[in-house]
């Protein structure tokens, strides 16, 4: 951690200032930029401003230019996801619905047949795997025996966020007991890769 000892005249003594340790180091910024570029998760219009903001946080100035140089080739050859959709704001809005336990209505385009479905859902988590962000949610009012291969499975349904064509956060809330809450970390342990 980067810390400095500074004299504080108001307190009449020296204090340990750890303000600098709260910021990312240049090497940490480089690592995060590399991870983002490798993820290929966003269109350039959303990815590049995030990279630029991270790089601008580098100090001193020569480090800023060094990080720019170190990622310049990957940035130039960056391959956007095939879906070509912007969704960063959607991630935030869905995350807010999850946090507030708001019911949502989504229009979703299925991967395997392109069919569109409207679902009323209880969103419980956002995951990332293999180039895509996913929404984990429980479907309200669905006949599990009719629509699910394993009706006894209590796991949420997984939706690729870029395939959600429209969504609306409803004023209605759903109850979730602490013991039944969805845990992204546990899901990650059980499912290595989710394919869209």
Task: Give residue spans per PLM region.
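Residue-level signal for tight coil/turn positions that link beta-strands
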Residues: 9-11, 130, 161, 171
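Surface-exposed, charged, gly/pro-rich loop-and-adjacent secondary-structure segments at domain edges
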Residues: 136-196
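Short helix-to-loop capping/linker segments positioned immediately adjacent to catalytic or ligand/cofactor-binding
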Residues: 40-43, 112-116, 190-196
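Loop-centered beta-sheet repeat module
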Residues: 96-145, 155-157
């Amino acid at each position: 951690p980067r810390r400095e000892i500074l004299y504080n005249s108001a307190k009449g003594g020296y204090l340990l200032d750890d303000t600098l340790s709260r910021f990312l180091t240049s090497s940490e910024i480089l690592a995060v930029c590399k991870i983002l570029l490798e993820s290929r998760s966003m269109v350039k219009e959303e990815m590049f401003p995030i990279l630029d903001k991270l790089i601008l946080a580098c100090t001193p100035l020569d480090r800023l230019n060094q990080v720019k140089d170190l990622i310049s080739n990957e940035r130039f050859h960056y391959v956007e996801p095939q879906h070509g959709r912007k969704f960063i704001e959607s991630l935030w809005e869905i995350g807010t619905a999850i946090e507030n336990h708001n019911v949502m209505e989504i229009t979703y385009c299925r991967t395997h047949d392109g069919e569109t479905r409207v679902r009323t859902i209880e969103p419980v988590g956002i995951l990332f795997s293999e180039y895509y962000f996913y929404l984990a949610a429980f479907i309200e009012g669905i006949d599990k025996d009719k629509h699910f291969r394993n009706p006894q499975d209590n796991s949420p349904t997984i939706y690729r966020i870029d395939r959600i064509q429209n969504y609306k956060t409803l004023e209605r809330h759903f109850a979730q007991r602490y013991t039944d809450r969805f845990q992204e970390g546990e899901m990650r342990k059980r499912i290595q890769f989710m394919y869209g």
